[in-house]
């Protein structure tokens, strides 16, 4: 695994709270077509020097670097919400109306 790597982070134009980590300078057209289609137009969020010990919001630098080394990208999806909680909130809102 790489000791450190400059990476670019993009957010999805189609899916909220979805981020793509790639090597800085990675060509969008070189990524899998299925990924590009689902992700939509990439919106640049930031560039950073990533090391294995770096802690990120939902993952670690080690996981991101390993994925980039293996498949040229790391896709961070939104955390799954417990549908019970979502349904409960919806019922509360409906009750208030």
Swiss-Prot record:
Coiled coil: none
Gene3D superfamilies reported for this sequence: YcgL domain (3.10.510.20)
Pfam families hit by this protein: YcgL (PF05166)
YcgL domain segment(s): 5-89
The protein's name: YcgL domain-containing protein Maqu_1609
Native source species: Marinobacter nauticus (strain ATCC 700491 / DSM 11845 / VT8) (Marinobacter aquaeolei)
């Amino acid at each position: 695994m790489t000791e450190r790597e400059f990476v670019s982070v993009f957010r999805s134009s189609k899916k909220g709270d979805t981020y793509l980590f790639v090597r800085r300078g990675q060509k969008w057209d070189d990524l899998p077509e299925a990924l590009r289609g689902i992700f939509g137009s990439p919106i640049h969020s930031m560039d950073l020097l990533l090391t294995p010990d770096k802690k990120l919001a939902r993952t670690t630098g080690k996981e991101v670097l390993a994925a980039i080394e293996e498949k040229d990208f790391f896709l961070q999806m939104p955390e799954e919400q417990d549908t019970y909680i979502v349904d409960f909130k919806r019922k509360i809102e409906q009750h208030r109306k």
